[in-house]
Amino acid sequence: MITITKLNDQEMVINCDLIELIETTPDTTITMTTGRKVIAKEPVESVLSSIVEYKKKLYAK
């Protein structure tokens, strides 16, 4: 699970295993496998870094 910030400054925790696509249009748009789309304030690189850090913690156990 990673935390992102929506455009209205509300934080949201999403399951990164359900992310299908991340686009910059110019905002960062995260499309989930369920079809739901979330627009995040963080740039794509930041979202990807959050996913990598989460996976490192998860598999380090």
Q: What spans do the regions from the language model cover?
A:
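Eukaryotic intrinsically disordered, low-complexity regulatory linkers and tails enriched in Ser/Thr/Pro
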Residues: 1-13, 17-61
